[in-house]
Regions:
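Helix-to-loop junction immediately C-terminal to a conserved catalytic motif
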Residues: 62
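ABC ATPase NBD coupling module
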Residues: 79-94, 244-247
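Q-loop/switch helix immediately C-terminal to the Walker
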Residues: 99, 106-118
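Conserved ABC ATPase "signature" region
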Residues: 125-143
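Conserved ABC ATPase signature
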Residues: 147-151
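Conserved catalytic motifs of ABC-family nucleotide-binding domains
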Residues: 168
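Conserved beta-strand-loop-alpha-helix hinge in the C-terminal portion
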Residues: 234-257
Length: 268
């Protein structure tokens, strides 16, 4: 039993002294000396203003590029995983790009099926029953045979989410999910991420560990359980929302609308 308990408490992500470079400009550093641990079942929001390197941080966390310095482990395996032999570990993590980043020459159905076709070598007919439940759950069914260019940004983001979920990841990284969304779609995302965190039916009720980036903390106050900030090339772990609100500071004013910041000040 002790051995099983140790496995359950092993971090899913761990960084020591990590420096992150820019994906588009490798010579530029966006964050330095990151020390961070993510446990199974965590729900993190990493906040920062536009241009602070949130997307680069998430791309590095998702093993799409190596850290400039430092060490990083995913499920105990050193990152990044570029070799084919350790790809299985990498596929336990899903990544949702800002905007969805679908292929416009493929239909929505074909975009979502890509991980199954490529990583599991499934044929079109074999993949279909595995993607249809996600089309339904994400309300994409009416546009399944359309191309991404035929639908709005609100829906394109969901295509990227469905594509990341078809392989049933244990960890999901989501870049700026609420950016550019109207209130209805933003509310849907918040509720759906809550369902993933609790354990979605399509994932056999297994909770997913979440790391989300955001430029506005307000929508996440009652949702996420852990918060961190990227500011001036520094990654700072803030803790729970109660700890964030108690700390206050200039950075909080930057990442909250004025009325939300006033409302969430701790009572003195």
């Amino acid at each position: 039993m002790a051995e099983g308990t140790a496995e359950l408490t092993e971090p899913v992500l761990r960084m020591e002294g990590v420096t992150v470079g820019s994906l588009h400009d490798p010579g530029m550093v966006v964050a330095e000396d990151i020390n961070w641990t993510v446990q199974p079942g965590d729900y993190w929001v990493v906040a920062g203003l536009q241009g602070t390197g949130k997307s680069d941080f998430l791309m590095m966390t998702g093993s799409l590029m190596a850290p400039v310095r430092g060490r990083y482990w995913l499920f105990g395996e050193p990152m990044p995983i570029f070799d084919e032999g350790r790809l299985k570990t990498r596929l336990r993590l899903g990544l949702v790009f800002d905007g969805g980043q679908s292929f416009n020459h493929l239909t929505i159905r074909e975009n979502i099926a890509l991980p199954l076709r490529y990583h599991r070598n499934l044929g079109k007919a074999e993949a279909e029953p595995l993607i249809q439940p996600w089309l339904d759950a994400l309300e994409l069914g009416p546009w399944a045979d359309s191309t991404p260019g035929a639908i709005g940004r609100n829906w394109q983001k969901r295509v990227g989410l469905a594509r990341a979920l078809v392989l049933h990841p244990e960890v999901l990284l989501v870049d700026n999910p609420l950016g550019g969304l109207d209130l209805r779609h933003a509310s849907w995302w918040l509720d759906f991420l809550d369902a993933l965190s609790r354990g979605h039916t399509l994932l056999d009720h297994r909770p997913v560990t979440l790391v989300v980036t955001a430029a506005n903390l307000q929508p996440w106050i009652a949702r996420a359980r852990q918060f961190a900030i990227l500011r001036e090339r520094r990654f700072s772990v803030l803790g729970t929302w109660a700890q964030v609100a108690a700390a206050g500071g200039e950075w909080l004013q930057e990442l909250l609308p004025a009325e939300a910041a006033d409302h969430n000040k701790p009572n003195r």
